[in-house]
Amino acid sequence: MKKTQQKEIENVTNITGVRQIELWRRDDLQHPRLDEVAEEVPVALVYNGISHVVMMASPKDLEYFALGFSLSEGIIESPRDIFGMDVVPSCNGLEVQIELSSRRFMGLKERRRALAGRTGCGVCGVEQLNDIGKPVQPLPFTQTFDLNKLDDALRHLNDFQPVGQLTSCTHAAAWMLPSGELVGGHEDVGRHVALDKLLGRRSQEGESWQQGAVLVSSRASYEMVQKSAMCGVEILFAVSAATTLAVEVAERCNLTLVGFCKPGRATVYTHPQRLSN
């Protein structure tokens, strides 16, 4: 295929994070067709000129990702600790250049780690097993949630995945009100990145983590639990299962963890006292 033709194919869709490419179906290997594929790019988070981490992510809402990652990793305590942020292209991907306060940057340098880039991986590159896991203050018990309201939210979670609807290749994370209404959500090829985008956006907008819960389309790994708890989320619903370490972390930090969420079904792993039906 000529380069000009390939360029035209790539520009067919106007949805950020999607490209059309030429491919072949099993039942017709002689005739290529066009189909949508989710973009995945290396994204480097650069704090005060020093690259801290490279993650594979969808190339949209990266400011929210950077803010959410900074909060959920304990690099900052609030959005006020970031003085400026720019997303710029680099030779192999994108950079989010973040200007931290001096105090926060000094703290980052003291415990800096290098992460290897894998899709949404929250463990890659830690130097010792003891470095896995961060101290999280036990969460308060300030709210309850009616599980009967979960079904409607599950039916609308896909509304926050325009790329996923075209490609079947993204995860979603959304904020769910006690009524079951989803009032904000993000998608990404990496489940941790999708969650960071949600955490970053709500924090930037000054929204409270009270009176609601996080709903994710993926499994619940320990990183998902820890990121949620670091930002003050008390209840985490996951469409798929939870891991043993996720359950242990949730139990320890008082987070209510619910998996296998389907209409009419849910498995409560920890702290059911926040739930009713």
Curated annotation (Swiss-Prot):
Keywords: Cytoplasm, Molybdenum cofactor biosynthesis. It is found in: Cytoplasm. One of its GO terms (cellular component) is cytoplasm. GO terms for biological process: Mo-molybdopterin cofactor biosynthetic process. InterPro entries: Cytidine_deaminase-like (IPR016193), FdhD (IPR003786). Mo-bis(molybdopterin guanine dinucleotide) binds at residues 260-265. One of its GO terms (molecular function) is sulfurtransferase activity. The active site is at 121 (cysteine persulfide intermediate). Belongs to the FdhD family. Required for formate dehydrogenase (FDH) activity. Acts as a sulfur carrier protein that transfers sulfur from IscS to the molybdenum cofactor prior to its insertion into FDH. HAMAP family: FdhD. This is Sulfur carrier protein FdhD.
